Every structure is written in C-alpha cells, then in structure tokens.
C-alpha cells in the first residue's frame, strides 16, 4: 500500500455502509482519518454499523441528516447505490465537498496498476476472462469490485508487479476524481439505470468517466461495433485499441476466417472456444485485447478459452430434465442482455422474464422472440412483457406471482428438445435482494422438478 497522508486528521463522511462502505471506513480509519459513518438503516438492525461503532467510529443511523455536513467534512465517500439526488449529496455538492466512491480510494492507495472494465452488459464475464487469461499468463492479477473482494481491501495488499482487474458500474464511475486505469475497456452502451441517471446521455457520460484521467501512456479498449461507445471514446486521451465481431481491425482485435486475431496475428479458432453465445465473442475480444496489451501469450489465452464455460447467473447451464435444457441468465437485468441470450439458441425457447419496473416498455424484444414458443412472466413488469408478447404473436403467454410458479409453468409448456431460459430483462429488486438470489431460487425450483 502506498504511503498516503492526505486523509490524516480529516473529517470524512462515509455515506451508506454495505460491503464497500464498511471497507472504506475501515481503511480511512487506518489512514488516520476521523471517520463519520452514516446509513439509512436503524442501528438496531445494522450489524456492520455496530461493528464500526465498536471500532471507535462515530456512527449515525436511521436517516441522512444534513447536520452531518456541519462537521467540517473534507470528503464524502458514498455507496454507489445512493443517488446523487439524495438531499445530503445535493447539499454536499452545494458546499463543494468532494464526493467519491470506494474505487477512488482503492486507486489512491494501490501500488499496482488498474484495469477497469465497464459497459451495460458483459462486464462480469469480461472481467473473469481477463483475470483468468492474466493468471494463466503469470501476470499476477488480483480481482476486485462487484465480483471478488471490495476494491480498497484488495488495493491495500496489491504489489507493484500485480494488476488489479475490476468491474466498474456507472454508479461507481460517477464518483471518481483521480482514478486512472492503465487499461480501460468500454464494452457497450444500452439504455439502462434511467431511474438513477435520468437519460441515456447522462448514463453514457458516467460510463465515460473511465477515460477521464487517461494519458497517451494508457490504453482504451473500445467496441468498434457500438456507435455510442465510439462517440464516447472521444473523451479518452489513451491509445485506442478497437475490437469488432463484424469488421476487420488491423491494429486491434477481430474475427477473420472463423478465428480471433489481435493486431493481425491469429490467436484461436472460434470452434475451439467453449463459451456459448455470439455476444460472448465481444467479451472475449475485449478480454483478449487487455491480456495481449499486458504481454500475455497466445498459448495462455487459448488454454483459458478452451476451458472457460461462463460465470454463474450468466447463461449458466443448470441441468437437463427429460431432454429440456435449463439455463439461468438472472444477470440479464436489461433488454439488451436478454436479446443476446435469446440470440444464443437455435432451439425453441420457453422464456421466464420479469422484475422491477423502471418505466420502459419491452417492444425492443419483439424481433428476438422468433424462437420463443412460450413466455411466463412475473414481477412488476409482467403486464408490459405480456403486451410485447401479444404484439409478437406468441401463442402461449402466462403471468404468475412467483418465480417458483413460473418454473413449474415453463416446464409444463416445454417439450423434448426445448430450452427453458430465465432471462428476466429486468432488475430483481421488486421481489429479491439481488440477481444472485433470484438465480439461486430459479436453480432450486428447477431441481424440485426432478
């Protein structure tokens, strides 16, 4: 860990606990800050807050009182999930108090360089692929962020010869000041999180913060097939490395003659890759680009791509029952992810979809329903998905209250050779704590059918 003195004896407000807030508060105390921790959940229900209080921190729970800002606060470290429209953040901004997220702290203390990966979809798969390729190539990666350990915990122990690989959301990237990844990858942009950002433009600009501090000594890995990403790459001063599944890229990554190439050199045949789905070729090209930029051999990349079958809750194969294959794609929290999941199969599909209503309709899914023989909807968006399915002319359309019911109905509508696919196209928070919980409940319900 770098020797950092900028936080010593400063009053720093950690807003929102959870894993990242807990780690940030603990780190800041270690760095000599006077830490004030604030969380909306009452202290009596807040185990993490009680632990921080026992460490000697000033803990205020049950709301976000504006009076906290009267304590000569030098910095606010916010939980990514707390919107900037929250009154305490609005007031902090008016007082010109810097507001950052935990990943910014991680960067400031880390001896190791960062690889940052963002995009609307594919972040986790690309992050895991990158980690595995670098590990196989003996480049000493450590993984941090939404998968793995919280970034500022990893950064404390990361050495100069290692590399921190982290998945970054728009929420996290809105709170960066000095964060400068050696390699920044921007995979794609799709209209999402409008309840948080307001517009797709603002959402895209938040994502583009990944390029904010890059220089000509850094690299920006860009999806050449995504017009929005290409436009936002103008914010990068780094060396641009493009990847594409549709056109030949001489100085980047592409698919040519059914093989993956990087800077004109063949790396692997597409037929040797075990990870399913056309969309995953984009993720693979991005990960391969990062790995090659860090000196990983073609042999190491090939070894990984011949064994990597995917990440849990991302088009995860569950089991086969009476020749029906069940797949868990609970991480599909927006339409683009579900479109890509539906495009991954040629067999008839029984689709389970639904979840949190963020105000959008689902007509964009209609062209992807060509292999969908039946849909079972659940959650807040069930009526909207039913409308889209009716417009698509699906014969079998059902709505149920719970995911358990949806699994039973989906199985009843399936036949020999079908795929039963959970790909909700929505966030999970209307009925579940996380998409992981939703996926686990789906898997449990499937196994009950056996």
Swiss-Prot record:
Molecular function (Gene Ontology), one example: ATP binding
Official protein name in the record: UDP-N-acetylmuramoylalanine--D-glutamate ligase
Keywords for this protein: ATP-binding, Cell cycle, Cell division, Cell shape, Cell wall biogenesis/degradation, Cytoplasm, Ligase, Nucleotide-binding, Peptidoglycan synthesis
Job description of the protein: Cell wall formation. Catalyzes the addition of glutamate to the nucleotide precursor UDP-N-acetylmuramoyl-L-alanine (UMA).
PANTHER family per record: UDP-N-ACETYLMURAMOYLALANINE--D-GLUTAMATE LIGASE
Family stated for the protein in its record: Belongs to the MurCDEF family.
Highest classification ranks of the organism: Bacteria, Bacillati, Bacillota, Bacilli, Bacillales
Pfam families registered for this protein in UniProt: Mur_ligase_C (PF02875), Mur_ligase_M (PF08245), MurD-like_N (PF21799)
Protein location: Cytoplasm
InterPro entries referenced in this protein's UniProt entry, alphabetically: Mur-like_cat_sf, Mur_ligase_C, Mur_ligase_C_dom_sf, Mur_ligase_cen, MurD
Reactions that this protein is recorded to catalyse: UDP-N-acetyl-alpha-D-muramoyl-L-alanine + D-glutamate + ATP = UDP-N-acetyl-alpha-D-muramoyl-L-alanyl-D-glutamate + ADP + phosphate + H(+)
Principal subcellular localisation of the protein: cytoplasm
């Amino acid at each position: 860990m770098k020797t950092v003195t900028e936080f010593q004896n400063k009053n720093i407000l950690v807003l929102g606990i959870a894993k990242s807030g807990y780690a940030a508060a603990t780190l800041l105390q270690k760095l000599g800050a006077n830490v004030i921790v604030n969380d909306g959940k009452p202290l009596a229900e807040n185990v993490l807050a009680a632990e921080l209080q026992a460490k000697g921190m000033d803990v205020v729970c049950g709301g976000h009182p504006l009076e906290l800002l009267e304590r000569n606060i030098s910095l606010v470290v916010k939980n990514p999930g707390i919107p900037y429209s929250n009154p305490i953040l609005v007031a902090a901004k008016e007082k010109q108090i810097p507001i950052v997220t935990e990943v910014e702290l991680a960067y400031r203390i880390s001896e190791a360089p960062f690889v940052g990966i963002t995009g609307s979809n594919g972040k986790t798969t690309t992050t895991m692929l990158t980690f595995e390729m670098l590990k196989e190539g003996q480049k000493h990666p450590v993984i941090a962020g939404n998968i793995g350990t919280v970034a500022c915990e990893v950064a404390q122990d990361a050495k100069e010869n290692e590399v921190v690989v982290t998945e970054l959301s728009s929420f996290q990237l809105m709170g960066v000041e000095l964060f400068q990844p050696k390699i920044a990858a921007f995979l794609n942009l799709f209209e999402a999180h409008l309840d948080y950002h307001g517009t797709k433009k603002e959402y895209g600009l938040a994502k583009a913060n990944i390029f904010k501090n890059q220089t000509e000594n850094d690299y920006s890995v860009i999806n050449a097939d995504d017009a929005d990403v290409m436009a936002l790459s103008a914010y990068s001063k780094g060396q641009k490395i493009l990847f594409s599944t549709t056109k030949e890229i001489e100085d980047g990554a592409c698919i040519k003659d059914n093989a993956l190439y990087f800077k004109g050199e063949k790396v692997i045949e597409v037929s040797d890759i075990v990870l399913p789905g056309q969309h995953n070729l984009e993720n693979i090209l991005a990960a391969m680009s990062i790995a090659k930029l860090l000196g990983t051999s073609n042999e190491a990349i090939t070894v990984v791509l011949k064994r990597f079958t995917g990440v849990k809750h991302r088009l995860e194969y569950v089991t086969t029952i009476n020749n029906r294959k069940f797949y868990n794609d609970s991480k599909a929290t927006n339409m683009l992810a579900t479109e890509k999941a539906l495009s991954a199969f040629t067999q008839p599909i029984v689709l389970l979809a639904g979840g949190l209503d963020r105000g959008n309709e689902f007509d964009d899914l209609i062209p992807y329903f060509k292999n969908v023989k039946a849909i079972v909807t659940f959650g807040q968006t069930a009526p909207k998905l039913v409308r889209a399915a009716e417009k698509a002319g699906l014969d079998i359309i059902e709505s149920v209250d719970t995911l358990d019911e949806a699994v039973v109905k989906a199985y009843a509508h399936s036949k020999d050779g079908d795929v039963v696919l959970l790909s909700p196209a929505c966030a999970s928070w209307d009925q579940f704590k996380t998409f992981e919980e939703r996926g686990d409940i789906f898997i449990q319900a499937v196994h009950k059918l056996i």
